């Protein structure tokens, strides 16, 4: 049976593309170049990356809107289901014994729009290594849940986890996505350092967001255009057992279904 929503979207999409071709007088050689480029994106397995880089921010803004809840942000292509549930107090994201990077302590809370703690929430946390790679998505890293974990709030809604502070990194630039950005559009392919967050709780809309750090050189030129000012966090330094740690704090607010 035909899907009326698909028909509506497909017809308008193809009409827009045809109008674009006419308005810009796209020639047959240009059309063939575009077609070959699209084929190369598929052959490189970069369609998730390409779509995230150019369109996911817009989809995110349409899907979640703004209100008195925490702003959403793109999920990106590096999420992995099944991260371990961290039961330590405080929780510590899995890492190698000699994991390089500045130690980071994250504190915060999960509440609803009236300020009530959401104790049944599950917070998926993941971020890059100190050299900008993600476990399961880099041949340089073992296929295990490195710098990935799930955290649950305490009875008062508070959360705390320890990790390393992520760093800015370039999205893959050797493939067609990076080549388009760098060689043809004249843009860089850097993303500011960020922590990925996905929070689920019964009765609430899932929250997918990213948290950034004040002073990052790529906040104003993120290659994915995903930065929102309300998601940029100040960073303080504290001493824990004689070692300097980076301290960040953020309170999440979820919206009811």
From Swiss-Prot:
Entry-linked InterPro entries: Catechol_dOase_N, Chlorcchol_dOase, Intradiol_dOase_C, Intradiol_dOase_core, Intradiol_RC_Dioxygenase
GO MF, one example: ferric iron binding
Protein family membership: Belongs to the intradiol ring-cleavage dioxygenase family.
Protein name: Chlorocatechol 1,2-dioxygenase
Names of the cofactor(s): Fe(3+)
Single GO biological process annotation from the record: catabolic process
Keywords linked to the UniProt accession: Aromatic hydrocarbons catabolism, Dioxygenase, Iron, Metal-binding, Oxidoreductase
NCBIfam families from the UniProt entry: chlorocat_1_2 (TIGR02465)
Biological source species: Rhodococcus opacus
Name of the gene this protein is made from: clcA
Catalysis performed (reactions): 4-chlorocatechol + O2 = 3-chloro-cis,cis-muconate + 2 H(+); 3,5-dichlorocatechol + O2 = (2E,4E)-2,4-dichloromuconate + 2 H(+)
CDD domains reported for this sequence: 1_2-CCD
EC number(s) reported in the record: 1.13.11.-
Domain of life: Bacteria
Secretion signal, residue range per the UniProt entry: none
UniProt: Fe cation binding residues: 134, 169, 194, 196
Free-text remark on how the cofactor is bound: Binds 1 Fe(3+) ion per subunit.
């Amino acid at each position: 049976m035909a899907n009326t929503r698909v028909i509506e979207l497909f017809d308008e999409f193809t009409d827009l593309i045809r109008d674009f071709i006419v308005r810009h007088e796209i020639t047959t050689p240009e059309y063939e170049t575009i077609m070959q480029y699209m084929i190369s994106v598929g052959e490189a397995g970069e369609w998730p990356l390409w779509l995230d880089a150019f369109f996911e921010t817009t989809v995110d803004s349409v899907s979640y809107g703004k209100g008195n809840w925490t702003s959403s942000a793109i999920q990106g292509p590096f999420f992995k289901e099944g991260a371990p549930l961290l039961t330590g107090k405080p929780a510590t994201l899995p890492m190698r014994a000699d994991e390089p990077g500045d130690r980071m302590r994250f504190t915060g809370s999960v509440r609803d729009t009236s300020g009530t703690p959401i104790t049944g929430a599950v917070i998926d946390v993941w971020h890059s290594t100190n050299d900008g790679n993600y476990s399961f998505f880099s041949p340089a890293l073992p296929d295990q849940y490195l710098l990935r974990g799930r955290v649950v709030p305490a009875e008062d809604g508070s959360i705390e986890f320890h990790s390393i502070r992520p760093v800015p990194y370039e999205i893959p630039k050797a493939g067609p996505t990076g080549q388009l950005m760098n060689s043809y559009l004249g843009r860089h392919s850097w993303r500011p350092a960020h922590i990925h967050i996905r929070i689920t709780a019964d009765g609430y809309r899932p929250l997918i967001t990213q948290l950034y750090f004040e002073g990052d050189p790529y906040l104003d030129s993120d290659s994915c255009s995903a930065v929102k000012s309300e998601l940029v966090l100040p960073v303080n330094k504290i001493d824990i057992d004689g070692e300097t740690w980076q301290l960040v704090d953020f309170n999440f607010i979820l919206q009811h279904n």
